[in-house]
């Protein structure tokens, strides 16, 4: 099954909703990550020395990058049917940080929960599936670059 124009549009519109309140949704995203995997705190330099998730420029920048990469993956999936990493260092960075398969699952769950929150009454199973497919393609590309 190919990624459709409608799926790309759903990802793009909810990406815009996410960006409209980046501070709030960044904190929400990392709070969900740490609720699901408290040990993941050590993977993020901007979280290591704080008792709880707090808004910061680094936190926002990283959240924007994660969600932006998934959005870019949606665009690539629609255009080419696959995802090629624009940043060749992503695999090495994830290896250096000690990222393993279960971390990708946690990030996916947190990402989908955050998008549901950001989309509000525009959320649907179809929107969720579009983000899920785009995230899975990105995660596959990162894992490939890690090996």
From Swiss-Prot:
Root nodules. The modification Phosphoserine is found at residue 45. Transmembrane segments: none annotated. GO terms for biological process: nodulation. Keywords: Cytoplasm, Heme, Iron, Metal-binding, Nitration, Nitrogen fixation, Nodulation, Nucleus, Oxygen transport, Phosphoprotein, Transport. Its main location: cytoplasm. O2 binds at residue 62. It is found in: Cytoplasm, Cytosol; Nucleus. SUPFAM superfamilies: Globin-like (SSF46458). Heme b binds at residues 45, 65, 94, 97. It holds the Pfam family Globin. Nitrated in effective nodules and particularly in hypoxic conditions; this mechanism may play a protective role in the symbiosis by buffering toxic peroxynitrite NO(2)(-). Nitration level decrease during nodule senescence. GO terms for cellular component: cytosol; nucleus. The modification Nitrated tyrosine is found at residues 25, 30, 135. PANTHER family: LEGHEMOGLOBIN-RELATED, NON-SYMBIOTIC HEMOGLOBIN 2. This is Leghemoglobin-1. It comes from Medicago sativa (Alfalfa). The lineage of its organism: Eukaryota, Viridiplantae, Streptophyta, Embryophyta, Tracheophyta.
């Amino acid at each position: 099954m190919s990624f459709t124009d409608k799926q790309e549009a759903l990802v793009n519109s909810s990406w815009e909703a996410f960006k409209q309140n980046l501070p709030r949704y960044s904190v929400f995203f990392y709070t969900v990550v740490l609720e699901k995997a408290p040990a993941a705190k050590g993977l993020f330099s901007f979280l290591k020395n704080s008792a709880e998730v707090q808004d910061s420029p680094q936190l926002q920048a990283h959240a924007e990058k994660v969600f932006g990469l998934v959005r870019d993956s949606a665009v690539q999936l629609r255009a080419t049917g696959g995802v090629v990493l624009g940043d060749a260092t992503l695999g090495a960075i994830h290896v250096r940080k000690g990222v393993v398969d279960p971390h990708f699952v946690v990030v996916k769950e947190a990402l989908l929960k955050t998008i549901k929150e950001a989309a509000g009454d525009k959320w649907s199973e179809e929107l969720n599936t579009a983000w899920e497919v785009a995230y899975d393609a990105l995660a596959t590309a990162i894992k490939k670059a890690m090996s």
